[in-house]
Amino acid sequence: MIKLSNITKVFHQGTRTIQALNNVSLHVPAGQIYGVIGASGAGKSTLIRCVNLLERPTEGSVLVDGQELTTLSESELTKARRQIGMIFQHFNLLSSRTVFGNVALPLELDNTPKDEIKRRVTELLSLVGLGDKHDSYPSNLSGGQKQRVAIARALASNPKVLLCDEATSALDPATTRSILELLKDINRRLGLTILLITHEMDVVKRICDCVAVISNGELIEQDTVSEVFSHPKTPLAQKFIQSTLHLDIPEDYQERLQAEPFADCVPMLRLEFTGQSVDAPLLSETARRFNVNNNIISAQMDYAGGVKFGIMLTEMHGTQQDTQAAIAWLQEHHVKVEVLGYV
């Protein structure tokens, strides 16, 4: 449905040249939810704006539904853009128009008959859960409701593709979850292809089928969500995955934790499990093999793309030789082990 090939985008600011994208290629199959994740300034927004040519690539090819957009005339491009809806971090609603009027706007601009506009807008507001807000104004809506109006407006022309530019980053966590569930529901009901960009791995984990990691204008990793969470290939992907798990050292342990070993101490370990290592009984196996005992302090597990992953804080009791051997064995079995200190 979306195929970007060798996209390069260069900006010129006076005598300065800024390369925002460098030889980026990306394929989003029809009906998928595809996420692009990266830090601020990585090139995410430039990339998604190249899909509908809000930013025209310096080099490269942009195919949407089999049509090469970079070769179209302005009138042809305007027509093609009707098949590409877009929502943004800021909702960009017209404050002087009601909810109905905001959603109706693209249909009015397309000279759609009034009866058809009424039918379509009513249908869309019902779809996004705002069937009772026809006559409300944006100033009377919450942030989540405003984004629902923006989604309905983006769907007004029956697009085949929806682009989401940091669409949930201005929302609180509960509202973010509800908007993501709405996007997932729309994807299922309408077969809509969704390309979203974000700096939050929680967004990717919750609704995406595939994910690409962007850094300094280059895609450094892309695969299914389950594969990236199971076997992240780059340090940046690992960092984003770790950001979805939050496990603090309990206060009483922080007070006792020492950086260097001392008499009768035990190491405190942070264990990170991904993919196959999650379900394998590795801790009980280390106890049998190396005569060590693990006292689990706290743990957190989660799912992404059907794959379980998680982290654990544990004290490992045993001789220095046995604990070192057990740690090495865990690492051989795809567990990331960090010695946080000694207690």
UniProtKB/Swiss-Prot annotation:
It catalyses: L-methionine(out) + ATP + H2O = L-methionine(in) + ADP + phosphate + H(+); D-methionine(out) + ATP + H2O = D-methionine(in) + ADP + phosphate + H(+). Its EC number is 7.4.2.11. InterPro entries: AAA+_ATPase (IPR003593), ABC_MetN_proteobac (IPR012692), ABC_transporter-like_ATP-bd (IPR003439), ABC_transporter-like_CS (IPR017871), ACT-like_dom_sf (IPR045865), MetN_ABC (IPR041701), MetN_ABC_transporter-like (IPR050086), NIL_domain (IPR018449). ATP binds at G38, A39, S40, G41, A42, G43, K44, S45. It holds the Pfam family NIL. Keywords: Amino-acid transport, ATP-binding, Cell inner membrane, Cell membrane, Membrane, Nucleotide-binding, Translocase, Transport. Transmembrane segments: none annotated. It is a peripheral membrane protein. It comes from the Bacteria. Residues 2-241 form the ABC transporter domain. It is found in: Cell inner membrane. Its main location: membrane. GO terms for cellular component: Gram-negative-bacterium-type cell wall; plasma membrane. GO terms for molecular function: ABC-type D-methionine transporter activity; ATP binding; ATP hydrolysis activity. Belongs to the ABC transporter superfamily. Methionine importer (TC 3.A.1.24) family. The complex is composed of two ATP-binding proteins (MetN), two transmembrane proteins (MetI) and a solute-binding protein (MetQ). Part of the ABC transporter complex MetNIQ involved in methionine import. Responsible for energy coupling to the transport system. This is Methionine import ATP-binding protein MetN. It comes from Escherichia coli O6:K15:H31 (strain 536 / UPEC).
